[in-house]
């Protein structure tokens, strides 16, 4: 019986925008009546999700406000609520969300905005605003609530009272969820924040990654930092691995890969690997969330990419879904955010031009189950390649091998039987461009290996 011996991803210049692999579309919503932003013609921004009373909900921001969808039944997804923003229109680029103790917190960075708090505890029957005011702050770029301590962290904050003040970051105690109390602020800019049990990772823009102990929120203690790393740019966002030993972060610069950092010793944070979509030399990861052994990334221009991170030193793509059809990568369009916590059949994605996506990533998660057993020593290089590839099966006794190349749509592009331990193939005449999947078949027991160079 013929079995897959090797399955790998091979990049052949030049890379193009992709369609999908191992990810299926469940639902898409886009309201053409909503205004686009003056910058980049974006209509939508952040995505969030929550479960309450056995119902699942998706939250997406737009230039006009907040849209909440009931996604409980994949066959009948619909918009359940719309919350108008205090500020609306073409100037609105950023909204952000987090839920805590039956409340959804809604913020915005532009215009005469407010913080809004929505009581969601009685859904599906009803939900209503219980707070809509600029008394705490008028604007903020984003928020993160550490639910273990009831502390809300906010980046790029503008307050109006008692006098206008711009803060790089502010921290609020949610002991009373309807009355956030400021307990700390700093002037140094922080773009994004991740906190787990009061250990707080600050993606500090041009100042790299910083880590603090906020167990006493009014007096944080510095624990460590990382600067001067390869591909350092505008440190934008990040997420901690479930085991707490590694942290993945992205710099919002064209062509810069994500960095996987070992954070077991915060006095010596080390980048142990890089990961990228590989779609274009200018691809940019925007936001990322980790659930289990999988990293979910919303990429500008490239859509959703899912990576297996079970080995932090060898991060592998296992699925993707492109939501932005144009092939340009020079701007900041396409996917904004991702939310995977409603389950593999309800992964939420927001695209700035085309709206809300509900995606089924079951195949992407199952894909890696067949990759755990593999034959070591097989090499396919160079990768990326410009036409010629070399295949070295090493010292493995596997007999004749058949090579097959497929494009992202699953169409067979090329096949050949290999009889030598090392083979060089010139594929230039095929004029293959973009992401290509290479499979090597043997006649022996199933052995599967993915190679990433």
Language-model regions, residue ranges each:
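Compositionally biased, intrinsically disordered low-complexity segments enriched
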Residues: 7, 11-13, 69, 118, ...
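C-terminal outer-membrane/trafficking sorting elements
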Residues: 373-381, 385-453
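Bacterial Sec-dependent N-terminal signal peptides
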Residues: 1-20, 411, 437
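N-terminal regions of proteins, emphasizing targeting and processing segments when present
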Residues: 8-10, 365, 374
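Selective for proline/serine-rich intrinsically disordered segments
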Residues: 1, 175-178, 218, 380-382, ...
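Feature marking well-ordered beta-strand scaffolds used for ligand recognition
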Residues: 17-366
């Amino acid at each position: 019986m013929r079995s897959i011996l090797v399955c790998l991803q091979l990049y052949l210049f030049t890379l193009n925008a992709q369609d999908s692999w191992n990810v299926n579309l469940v639902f898409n919503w886009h309201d053409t009546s909503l205004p686009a932003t003056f910058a980049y013609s974006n209509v939508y921004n952040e995505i969030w999700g929550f479960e309450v009373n056995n119902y699942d909900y998706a939250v997406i921001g737009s230039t006009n406000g907040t849209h909440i969808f009931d996604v409980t039944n994949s066959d009948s997804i619909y918009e359940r609520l719309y919350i108008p923003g205090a500020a609306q229109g073409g100037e609105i680029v950023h909204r952000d969300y987090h839920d805590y103790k039956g409340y959804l917190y809604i913020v915005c960075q532009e215009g005469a905005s407010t913080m809004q708090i929505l009581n969601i505890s009685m859904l599906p029957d009803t939900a209503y605003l219980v707070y809509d005011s600029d008394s705490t702050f008028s604007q903020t770029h984003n928020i993160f609530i550490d639910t273990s301590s009831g502390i809300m962290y906010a980046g790029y904050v503008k307050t109006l009272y008692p006098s206008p003040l711009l803060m790089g970051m502010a921290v609020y105690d949610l002991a009373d969820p309807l009355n956030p109390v400021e307990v700390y602020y700093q002037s140094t800019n922080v773009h994004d924040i991740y906190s787990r049990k009061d250990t707080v990772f600050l993606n500090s823009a041009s100042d790299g990654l910083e880590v603090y102990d906020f167990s006493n929120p009014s007096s944080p203690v510095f624990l460590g930092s990382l600067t001067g790393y390869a591909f350092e740019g505008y440190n934008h966002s990040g997420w901690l691995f479930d085991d707490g030993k590694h942290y993945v972060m992205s710099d919002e610069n064209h062509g810069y890969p994500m960095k996987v950092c070992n954070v077991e010793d915060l006095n010596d944070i080390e980048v142990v690997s890089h990961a990228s979509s590989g779609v274009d030399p200018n691809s940019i990861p925007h936001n990322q969330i980790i659930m289990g052994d999988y990293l979910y990334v919303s990429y500008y221009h490239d859509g959703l990419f899912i990576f297996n991170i079970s080995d932090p030193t060898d991060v592998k793509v296992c699925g993707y879904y492109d939501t932005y059809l144009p092939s340009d990568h020079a701007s900041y369009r396409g996917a904004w955010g991702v939310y995977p916590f409603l389950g593999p059949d309800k992964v939420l994605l927001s695209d700035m031009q085309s709206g809300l996506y509900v995606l089924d990533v079951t195949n992407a998660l199952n894909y890696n189950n067949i990759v755990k057993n593999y034959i070591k020593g097989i090499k396919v290089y160079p990768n990326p390649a410009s036409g010629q590839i070399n295949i070295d099966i090493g010292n493995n006794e596997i007999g004749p091998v058949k090579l097959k190349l497929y494009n992202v749509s699953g169409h067979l592009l090329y096949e050949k039987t290999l009889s030598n331990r090392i083979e060089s193939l010139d594929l230039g005449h095929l004029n293959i461009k973009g992401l290509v999947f290479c499979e090597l078949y043997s006649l022996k027991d199933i052995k599967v290996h993915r190679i990433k160079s």
